[in-house]
Amino acid sequence: MPKSIFSFFSGVGLLDLGFDTAGYDIVFVNEFKEEFLKAYRFARQNRIADPIYGYHRCSIDDFFTCSYNAFLQHSIHLERNSGNIIGFVGGPPCPDFSVAGKNRGRNGENGILAQSYVNLITQFLPDFFVFENVKGLVKTERHRIYFDELKQQLQTAGYYISDQVLNSLSFGVPQDRDRIILVGIHRDFYGRNQHAVPENNLQFPWLQHALFGNAEEIKAEDWETTDPFHENSNRYFPRQTPNRYRELCVETWFRRNNVDNHPNANDVFRVKQGLHKMQTIPEGDVSGKSFKRLHRWRYSPTAAYGNNEVHLHPYRVRRLSVAEAMAIQSIPAWFTLPTNMTLSNKFKVIGNGVPVLMATAIAQTLSELLDEIVAN
């Protein structure tokens, strides 16, 4: 059965891109920031069809008001009448739950949006949903209490749920990035197939489409640590690192995406201060709070480019370009951001997104589970 996605907090659509790659139809897109929404449309032009119910620049809370509410309800009704499976996907803004962010929790201006998203799900009752956020939502005790309350609300509304902290390394992304993913399937979706209804929580095979195993085992391998920095130097893939992990290396993705010739190759912040430091930090030294130099034959730290964190190119005297940051997020080479988008917003929207390979794997696993329920 066709699967229709209603996307919220879409950003530039990296989570959506994963679902699109896995065969879902993105039919509705909602993003509050105008520049992000314009970039979403720009990146997909001539390659992916526009959502049939349009792009909506508004707050998620607007969907509880008359006109927006009626339009969303009508759109869902049309999809149901077409026999399509309905899904909501979204990652509410996460600075209020991030250890590196404001950490204000449920009462922060972003933190309250997690509640709004859950309220939307429990009002419109899609067949399934995906909720994505930073691991701080479950690793910090007071945030975990809030998360448990949200899950209880979803269960009361009839959803069988499963959540897991996942690391993007497991899915072939050249980046050490943890995210909490929560998925749910509504009890009504099971219909007559009552023997498939979970006894308690949804049994979701989180690593079914993972390219590699446990991320901690990956990180425990014999990776390159640091090497003296030499501008434009050549270094071969190290013998001690298993060859299968070449896929997780920054340099592999730089070459795959041909980042030097990418339309966003010249989108780079020029450093006005700290040039000497950039010339002396060893390749692979990511121990600093601010300046971190990536190693070409290792994975990147989390692609978070705010809070004074500066990621340096492995063998050039500069920061990473937008094209390179996109490669580290496993974004395909054809994906580009518009020239008139501010550089700050380009890095922000990339860093906020879900790595595409990770999103694709989750979408594939969910699709197979939904198909299995329908088939039985």
Describe the residue ranges of each PLM region:
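Class I S-adenosyl-L-methionine
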Residues: N69-S82, P95, V99-D285
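Extracellular structured ligand-interaction cores
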Residues: I85, R177-R179, R298-S300
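Beta-sheet entry/capping signal
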Residues: I26, F128, P301-T302
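Redox-cofactor binding/interface segments in oxidoreductases and associated redox assembly factors
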Residues: G90, F131, Y305
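Core alpha/beta nucleotide-donor-binding catalytic domains of modification enzymes
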Residues: P2-L125, K135-I145
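Short, conserved catalytic/metal-binding motifs centered on acidic residues
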Residues: F88, L182, G351
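Short, solvent-exposed loop/turn segments at secondary-structure junctions
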Residues: G13, E34-E35, P93-P95, K135-G136, ...
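C-terminal target-recognition/interaction regions appended to catalytic cores
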Residues: Q240-N376
